[in-house]
Regions:
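Conserved Nudix-box catalytic region and its N-terminal flanking loop in Nudix hydrolases
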Residues: 23-67, 161-168, 173
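Nudix hydrolase/Nudix homology domain
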Residues: 37-38, 104-157
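Active-site-adjacent alpha-helix immediately C-terminal to a catalytic or transition-state-stabilizing loop
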Residues: 235-293
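N-terminal strand-loop-strand
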Residues: 1-41, 147-152
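Active-site-proximal alpha-helix that buttresses catalytic centers in soluble enzyme cores
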Residues: 44, 55, 143-229, 258, ...
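Unchanged
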Residues: 46-69, 77-129
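A short coil-to-beta-strand element that immediately follows conserved catalytic motifs
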Residues: 67-76, 214-219
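Non-catalytic terminal regions with compositionally biased, polar/charged low complexity
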Residues: 126-132, 136, 262, 266, ...
Length: 308
């Protein structure tokens, strides 16, 4: 096998079969590619420097014409791609995506789109890897509740700040990270924003609040001062925040997030390989009712202001 790994991303694009009757379930979008004469799920190669999420949303929009609300991660599919006589490994990152608006227009690359029930989609898909991915989607409910657990952005050094620590603001790097988080987190269409009552936490989500016109509510239980002794309250808050099928953003601190994640994943018997919590990073937590189904880590956005 020669050549480097091809990175790609895509989505299982779904919508309710009947918006007024949830019991009728969902249907998914399957596309036909005339070049290969196959039926597949929408996906494509990442552009240079493009993140997996940005690439997935761009490719789904380009191939289907639909804007989406990002849902839970569906993991990777891996296979070998033959290109010009060279075999190269290909890794595709996938997300569940709810169609929110759009219209399909045929192109040279995709000449047909069908909205079909899950069983029919499984029979129609040409590649085994796509069928396996659809099975992953089916194993979890489509309309899940999402909590985006964000660590505050860069705020300089605690030792260099002469005022009360809870008043320490974001630095230039932190403001750049906060601005970039708007683009990332807006893909999930948050309907509620909660922050620890520390200035650097509220400032981290202020740009998102302005862009989404969603107010920021503070809750001291997510702060390093309010969390000790109230751990059970914080876990309970995570389980109910955002409503039955909404998306909430919670901005917290590095002394809180690892322990909070460990408590809720242990309680729901979900194993994490590691619990990272870098400044401006995000954990995407997906729930069915109040039970945690998945936890996926998104590293901090890369911004020039933080390169020095």
């Amino acid at each position: 096998m020669n050549g480097g790994t091809i990175r790609a991303a895509g989505g299982v694009l779904w919508r309710a079969r009947d918006p007024w009757d949830a019991s009728r379930g969902v249907e998914v979008a399957i596309i036909h590619r005339p070049r290969y004469d196959d039926w597949s799920l929408p996906k494509g190669k990442l552009a240079a420097g493009e993140s997996d999420i940005d690439g997935a949303i761009r490719e789904v929009l380009e191939e289907t014409g639909f804007h989406v609300r990002l849902g839970r991660s569906l993991g990777d599919t891996r296979y070998v791609k033959e290109m010009d006589g060279v075999s190269r490994p290909k890794v595709v990152r996938w997300w569940a995506m709810e169609a929110t608006a759009g219209t399909f227009v045929p192109t040279r690359e995709v000449d047909e789109l069908r909205w079909v029930p899950l069983g029919e989609a499984h029979e129609l898909l040409s590649r085994e890897t796509d069928r396996e991915l659809l099975e992953r989607f089916v194993r979890g409910p489509a309309p899940t509740r999402v909590v985006l657990l964000v660590r505050h952005a860069s705020a300089g050094s605690r030792s260099a700040w002469t005022g009360e620590d809870r008043t320490r603001p974001l630095d230039l790097c932190g403001w750049a990270q906060a601005d970039e988080l708007v683009r990332l987190l807006a893909h999930f269409d948050p309907t509620e924003i909660v922050s620890a009552d520390y200035r650097r936490c509220t400032q981290t989500v202020e740009p998102l609040s302005g862009a989404m016109t969603v107010p920021v509510h503070t809750d001291p239980v997510f702060s390093e001062a309010g969390y000790p002794g109230c751990e059970a309250d914080a876990v309970a808050r995570l389980r109910e925040i955002g409503g039955p099928h909404g998306t909430a953003v919670v901005c917290s601190q590095g002394d809180v997030i690892p322990d909070l994640l460990k408590r809720i994943t242990d309680a729901d018997e979900l194993r994490l390989a590691s619990v990272e919590s870098r400044k401006a990073s995000t954990w995407v937590l997906t729930f069915l009712d109040d039970r945690l189904l998945g936890a996926d880590y998104l590293p901090p956005p890369r911004v020039p202001e933080c390169e020095n």
